[in-house]
Amino acid sequence: MSNAVKTNKRILALDILRGVTIAGMIMVNNPGTWAHIYAPLRHAEWNGLTPTDLVFPVFMFIMGISTYISLKKYNFEFSHAAGIKILKRTILIFLIGMAIGWFSKFCYYWTSPTEGISFGTQLWESVWTFDRIRILGVMQRLALCYGATAIIALTMKHKNIPYLIATLLTGYFILLLCGNGFAYNDTNILSIVDRTILTPAHMYKDNGIDPEGLLSTIPAIAHVLLGFCVGRMMLEGGKANEDRESMLNSHLIKLFLVGTILTFSGFLLSYGCPINKKIWSPTFVLTTCGLASSFLALLIWIIDVKGYKKWSLFFESFGVNPLFMYVLGGVLSILFGSICFPWGESSISIHTFLYKILLMPIFGETGGSLAYALLFVGINWCIGYQLYKRKIYIKI
């Protein structure tokens, strides 16, 4: 294996980009109302790409780079200890995702009970929702992609991983072509497989398509592997006596080159294979990984080369505890929508109070919806900043 570039300082831009994506995911998942959202803050209905469609895949790209960094301590050799650690983390992340889904159902049924039922029945209906919990989701996809990437990285020669990525994406494209995979309905092969294995009760409801479904996990794994390969390209093969500035400039050139090639390839191939987040199409992988690589290069230049880092503290608070902050955002969102207090002759949730009573009269429906999302991100940041200030890093 070639000599790895060694530095006495971590690349801050990685934490910042990770923090930007976590803050972005929290923001787009928590508008004041889904009925009034500015267009850039909506996901593409089917084919196409919006700024909102970038936050999750960029985070997954960074996760691939982080996986490379974290596995270096094992010298990329599989061992019983490494395998157990990877398995435990994969299961933990997956179960946390399931737990958030259960907690959401519990709060919904507890605060909206069937009229006329007893306390015991209400409690049972709220607790026992396992027959209708969504099995897959964002955290579950992260878990599966991390686990697969880590095992591949420890058991396969790294020079062969690009061929594996190409095979996965090409095979998935053929599957989409042969299985009506570009149709936005339940005749899509992705929908058929999910409904057969997961059953509709455990799926996201979107024209029969689960955006984090089983088959679309295949290109998502390729996505994280691409991030892993970029991490390897960045951090291996440098000169032992190379100074930090030269190393960072080398990063910039590599990242911009890779970013340009991937982005151009993704857009060019989109004429035959549409860019589509909900099915995680191969062109979606190429385009978003390319843009992520370019974003990272830009941030390295701004933060690590030029030293303009004062503005980045806000995002660093999210970036050093990324998964915890994402989980926190999900839990707080559920609580804000569930916890009610007396207001006039009825009761009102925290979410409704902040949006309809405080913000909507000032900013209007759409502006107030954005203001609520920003306020919610700010509330999460207050907690994240306290952890950051105390150097408390919660690893998930």
Identify the meaning behind each predicted range.
Residues M1-I396:
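Alpha-helical transmembrane segments and their immediate juxtamembrane cytosolic regions
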